[in-house]
């Protein structure tokens, strides 16, 4: 099977009802990003940070994978698929995808504020006084602004091996994830799916699809399956 990597962002989850912080009506409206998603904000007002992520975690149980998530999972029948996602939700997992790299962490995980290796699955609200095994306060297992991205090297390695790369639902404005596609082999086929894709300044080898995730994947699926069956990728 050919290697296919999906780089997904907030746009694909927005179609399931998860609000995005870059949209005018998004969940982050009214919040200074650095107040709720940075080590500075955590030190200044941990309760505010916990309240913010508790709200986001609760929202997960009100939304479901959409047809784009399910289409990406379906591609595992035809390709060796790895998903690199900037999203912290679990919609790819619930859609049936099996190999997912969460670059920016996961809402359903928490960790010790002292030891990032002490990670726990967490579905309820997180409160001050909830402690890890090392007696440190638990914090959201999220990569905050100003923190290193621990899985970046693994993500780069996956992109370097691809025959096909699909970038979907991301504005390509959040670094370092936005530059991942530049590590693809020059012979790799790259699709960029986003309602504003044609406005992006991308290399000529990137094929832009100016649609939302659901419609684009419905249109693209037959071609992707045909390419896999006919070994059309180098």
Curated annotation (Swiss-Prot):
Keyword tRNA processing: no
Residues involved in NAD(+) binding: 9-28, 86-89, 169-171, 217
Highest taxon listed in the record's lineage: Bacteria
Keywords: Cytoplasm, NAD, Transferase
EC number of the protein: 2.3.1.286
Gene Ontology cellular-component annotations: cytoplasm
Chief localisation class: cytoplasm
Pfam name, any one: SIR2
Residue ranges constituting the Deacetylase sirtuin-type domain according to the UniProt record: 1-234
Catalytic reaction annotation: N(6)-acetyl-L-lysyl-[protein] + NAD(+) + H2O = 2''-O-acetyl-ADP-D-ribose + nicotinamide + L-lysyl-[protein]; N(6)-succinyl-L-lysyl-[protein] + NAD(+) + H2O = 2''-O-succinyl-ADP-D-ribose + nicotinamide + L-lysyl-[protein]
Key word Electron transport present: no
This protein's domain notes: 2 residues (Tyr-53 and Arg-56) present in a large hydrophobic pocket are probably involved in substrate specificity. They are important for desuccinylation activity, but dispensable for deacetylation activity.
Listed name of the protein: NAD-dependent protein deacylase
Organism: Helicobacter pylori (strain J99 / ATCC 700824) (Campylobacter pylori J99)
């Amino acid at each position: 099977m050919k290697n296919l990597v999906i780089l997904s962002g907030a746009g694909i989850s927005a179609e399931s009802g998860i609000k995005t912080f870059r949209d005018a009506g998004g969940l982050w409206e009214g919040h200074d990003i650095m107040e709720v998603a940075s080590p500075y904000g955590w030190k200044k007002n941990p309760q505010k940070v916990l309240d913010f992520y508790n709200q986001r975690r609760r929202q997960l149980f009100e939304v479901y994978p959409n047809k784009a998530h399910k289409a990406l999972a379906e591609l595992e029948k035809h390709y060796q698929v790895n998903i690199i996602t900037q999203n912290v939700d679990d919609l790819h997992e619930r859609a049936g995808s099996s190999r997912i790299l969460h670059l920016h962490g996961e809402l359903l995980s928490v960790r010790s504020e002292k030891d990032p290796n002490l990670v726990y699955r967490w579905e309820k609200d997180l409160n001050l006084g909830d402690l890890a095994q090392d007696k440190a306060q638990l914090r959201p297992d999220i990569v905050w602004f100003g923190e290193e991205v621990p899985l970046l090297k693994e993500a780069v390695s996956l992109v370097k091996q691809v025959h096909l790369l699909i970038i979907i639902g991301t504005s390509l404005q959040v670094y370092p994830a936005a530059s991942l596609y530049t590590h693809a082999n020059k012979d790799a086929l790259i699709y960029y799916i986003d309602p504003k894709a044609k406005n992006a300044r991308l290399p000529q080898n990137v094929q832009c699809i100016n649609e939302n995730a659901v419609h684009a994947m419905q249109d693209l699926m037959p071609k992707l399956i045909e390419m896999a069956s006919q070994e059309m990728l180098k």
